[in-house]
Design a protein with these regions (language model features):
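A surface/extracellular/periplasmic glyco- and lipid-processing/surface-interacting theme
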Residues: 126-181
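Boundary at the C-terminal end of the N-terminal hydrophobic targeting segment
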Residues: 16-23
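Short, well-ordered beta-strand elements
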Residues: 77-80, 123-131, 197-200, 250-258
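Extended intrinsically disordered, low-complexity coil regions enriched in Ser, Thr, Gly, Ala
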Residues: 72-73, 82-105, 132-156, 197-228, ...
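Long, contiguous binding/interaction regions
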Residues: 57, 62-72, 155, 186, ...
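N-terminal secretory signal peptides that target proteins for export/translocation
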Residues: 1-2
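Short Gly/Thr-rich strand-loop-strand
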Residues: 25-59, 83-122, 158-192, 202-246
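Bacterial N-terminal signal peptides
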Residues: 5-15
């Protein structure tokens, strides 16, 4: 038992190390820490971001470490959120980004603005906020550059992003639960287009994916079979419009909110072609 506790303690220390190294005002010369460092877990995150903590918890929040840095009369808050995995970190990033601005190549993705910067790398999401009285883009850029160097691990965005057809694609986000408002689709990527939306959910196995698809088919009473991937159905729903949902191995995907099921099926077939086989 003593060995187990020691192992868990060592694991926690190793896990927290990158966050502690990034939450450091000395990343950039001329900046000093103001006040005490911040650390929050799932049990008390609401004390720091009351009203929005649930959004982080849904993505698999583990812990947060942060500091307030000061240089002269200027200040920057640096907060490092550790998530359960890299996809979850990317999900939090896309939930917080400015959709009107492009995603920059920082880690798996980032944005640097005059008063705010954010990026994700591996299982960490980093958010910086400058004094709102004055833009500090140069300082934010310097902090982001040094912070990104101190986080090891994955710098590539989730592979699923490349599966969605790019024509007239507006955005792609990781939805932590109830994809398309359907509880059976617990977590997945949703792509918004000028017309309609697509999704991909990754199940544990082809068998579990088949079970989910079967339940979805029963939910849409007038569903008809469709020739897409391993199995599929199409339907015309009151809320989701023309739709087609398919299974390819352990992946469930499809298109919804199309003018009719035929159009949805054609788009779903294009999506299925880009999803890797098992």
């Amino acid at each position: 038992m003593k060995s187990l506790r020691l192992a868990l303690l060592m694991l926690a220390v190793v896990s927290a190390a990158p966050a502690a190294e990034v939450a450091d005002c000395h990343l950039v010369a001329g900046w000093e820490q103001q006040g005490s460092a911040r650390r929050f877990t799932a049990d008390n995150l609401f004390e720091y971001i009351d009203g929005n903590a649930e959004g982080y918890l849904l993505y698999g929040f583990v812990q947060m470490q942060g500091v307030t840095c000061q240089s002269g009369g200027e200040s920057i808050l640096v907060d490092v959120f550790e998530m359960t995995d890299a996809d979850s970190a990317y999900g939090v990033f896309t939930a917080n980004l400015d959709p009107s601005l492009p995603i920059q190549k920082v880690g798996m993705g980032g944005q640097i603005m005059p008063r705010r910067a954010l990026f994700c790398k591996d299982k960490y999401y980093v958010q910086l906020a400058a004094n709102p009285e004055k833009g500090q883009m140069a300082a934010l850029r310097a902090f982001v550059r040094e912070a990104e160097k101190r986080i090891p691990g994955r710098s590539l965005p989730p592979a699923a992003l490349s599966w969605f057809p790019t024509e007239k694609l507006a955005s792609v986000r990781l939805i932590p639960e109830s994809v398309l408002g359907l509880r059976l689709l617990k977590r997945g990527f949703v792509a918004h287009y000028e017309l309609g939306q697509a999704f991909v959910v990754i199940e544990a196995s082809p068998e579990s994916a088949a079970a989910v698809l079967s339940k979805l088919r029963q939910r849409f009473g007038e569903a008809a079979p469709a020739q897409v991937a391993d199995e599929a159905f199409q339907a015309d729903d009151q809320y989701l419009g023309g739709m087609c949902i398919f299974r390819k191995g352990r992946y469930i995907g499809g298109f919804a909110n199309m003018p009719n099921p035929k159009d949805a099926t054609a788009q779903a077939a294009s999506l299925a072609e880009h999803i890797p086989g098992m």
